[in-house]
Amino acid sequence: MKKTPVVVIVGPTAVGKTKTGIELAKAFDGEIVSGDSVQVYRGMDIGSAKVTKEEAEGIPHHLIDICDPDDAMSVAMFQQLARAAIDDIYARGKLPIIVGGTGLYIRSILYDYEFVERPVDEALREELERLAEVEGREALHQRLVQLDPERAATIHPNNVRRVVRALEVAMQGDTQTTDSAPSEHYDYRLFVLHADREILYDRINQRVDAMMEAGLVEEVERLLAQGYRDTQAMRAIGYKEIIPYVEGKISKDRATDLLKQHTRQFAKRQLTWFRHQFDGIWVDMGRKSFELSYKNIYDDVEGFFRKFRLF
């Protein structure tokens, strides 16, 4: 049975994923499936760099604004929702395009991980807790950074209990799979967008400034007023830096600087993760104009999907 064709656009924040995905959707009659762990939450728009109505240019986007910030969202749940969206898109004769930066979520979509409930591994938990005592909290947190940078960015190193739990999930999953080497669920073409560090960091700094001007502080104030302060969602980069400013603990300049710093560090970890976890086509989005970089992607997608006779 022929697998469903899917295009996947991944990369660090501010590299140009959103624009690339939309241009491909316009060219190939596609729809976007968001692969971002924060954009699923309603009201978390500016801090997650959620696509605006103007930016979307009429292209449908899926898995955005599907739950509240205090709702649970696991990898298994995301996999189920994303695959349902992809199946629906393809059934209507459209091209599914996954766009995002949450590598663990995207891998769960692309590969045949079959999730079942997993009991707590007490031996593993004891070993991780022992490592925290012997090597220290920072060292334990660094292990999580290497395995799951997205999750690590939401947990403070001093919160050993949550670091240990996150490591358990990263090493075993909330669930277990029936295959240690899962097969590919889709016939996909994956592109990793990247740029030289200096160029990428400059874009990140500019994006943060634009987010602050667009009302990120006011967005965080609204979320706090709605009672979401202590939710997992509010520990995401873009929100955890602004909360101390809103609460009068740090200055606005300090909050802005922290957000830039954390976003740059996260982008570096994302690229490292993509390099080790995805076998894709790397596209430099910094040295050439967007048009030239996009044309390389367009030409590849056009050739790849000729065999499906979709276009």
From Swiss-Prot:
Catalytic activity: adenosine(37) in tRNA + dimethylallyl diphosphate = N(6)-dimethylallyladenosine(37) in tRNA + diphosphate
Record site feature (Interaction with substrate tRNA), residues: T102, R125
SUPFAM superfamilies tied to this protein: P-loop containing nucleoside triphosphate hydrolases
InterPro entries: Dimethylallyltransferase, IPT, P-loop_NTPase
Keyword Transferase in record: yes
Residues bound to ATP: G11, P12, T13, A14, V15, G16, K17, T18
Protein name, per record: tRNA dimethylallyltransferase
Organism: Exiguobacterium sp. (strain ATCC BAA-1283 / AT1b)
